[in-house]
């Protein structure tokens, strides 16, 4: 028989840097998860993605066991890394802060494809381009 789900926790944690300190510890403690067990597993699974923010969905069962799924980094984080900037524009329609090429957008779209609800890479590229424009980036190509 399948385990009963008690709670689902969604967090965004830097890869390889989950610690019991806030904000991770309190969120997991409230859900009744073994914090050290989760942080050890998460850090081991994301060690190769250092420097990225990794969204994670933690499913907690009634017997206090848990499973977690790591997703691809947010499109905004990937775009900022590709453009080499710290943050997007505060006024995206008037101030453009960076430029990304179609090739960079395609590469990000292919990376994000498993988490997007796009039928093909072209649709995923349009989604990523929209995110780029809303951050004040110019898409060339």
UniProtKB/Swiss-Prot annotation:
State the source organism's domain of life: Bacteria
**Modifications after synthesis and translation:** One or more lysine residues are methylated.
* Gene3D superfamilies reported in the protein's UniProt record: Ribosomal protein L11, C-terminal domain, Ribosomal protein L11/L12, N-terminal domain
Q: Which GO terms describe its biological process?
A: translation
Q: Could you tell me which InterPro entries the record lists for this protein?
A: Ribosomal_uL11, Ribosomal_uL11_bac-typ, Ribosomal_uL11_C, Ribosomal_uL11_C_sf, Ribosomal_uL11_CS, Ribosomal_uL11_N, Ribosomal_uL11_N_sf
Which keywords fit this entry according to its UniProt record? Methylation, Ribonucleoprotein, Ribosomal protein, RNA-binding, rRNA-binding
Q: Sorted alphabetically, which PROSITE patterns does this protein's record hold?
A: RIBOSOMAL_L11
A Pfam family hit: Ribosomal_L11_N
Write one Gene Ontology MF term: large ribosomal subunit rRNA binding
Subunit (UniProt) = Part of the ribosomal stalk of the 50S ribosomal subunit. Interacts with L10 and the large rRNA to form the base of the stalk. L10 forms an elongated spine to which L12 dimers bind in a sequential fashion forming a multimeric L10(L12)X complex.
Q: What does this protein do?
A: Forms part of the ribosomal stalk which helps the ribosome interact with GTP-bound translation factors.
Q: Which family does it belong to?
A: Belongs to the universal ribosomal protein uL11 family.
Q: PANTHER family this protein is in? A: 60S RIBOSOMAL PROTEIN L12, LARGE RIBOSOMAL SUBUNIT PROTEIN UL11M
Task: From the Swiss-Prot or TrEMBL record, give the protein name.
Answer: Large ribosomal subunit protein uL11
Q: Species name for this entry?
A: Lactiplantibacillus plantarum (strain ATCC BAA-793 / NCIMB 8826 / WCFS1) (Lactobacillus plantarum)
Q: Gene for this protein?
A: rplK
């Amino acid at each position: 028989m399948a385990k009963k789900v008690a709670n689902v926790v969604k967090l965004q944690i830097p890869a390889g840097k989950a610690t019991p300190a806030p904000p991770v510890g309190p969120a997991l403690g409230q859900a009744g998860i073994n914090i050290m067990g989760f942080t050890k597993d998460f850090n081991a699974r994301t060690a190769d993605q250092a420097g990225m923010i990794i969204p994670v969905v933690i499913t907690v069962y009634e017997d206090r066991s848990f499973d977690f799924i790591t997703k691809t980094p947010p499109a905004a984080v990937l775009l900022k890394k590709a453009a080499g900037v710290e943050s997007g524009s505060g006024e995206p329609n008037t101030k453009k802060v960076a430029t990304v090429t179609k090739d960079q957008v395609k590469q990000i779209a292919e990376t994000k494809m498993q988490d997007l609800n796009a039928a093909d890479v072209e649709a995923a590229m349009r989604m990523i381009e929209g995110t780029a424009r809303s951050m004040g980036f110019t898409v060339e190509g």
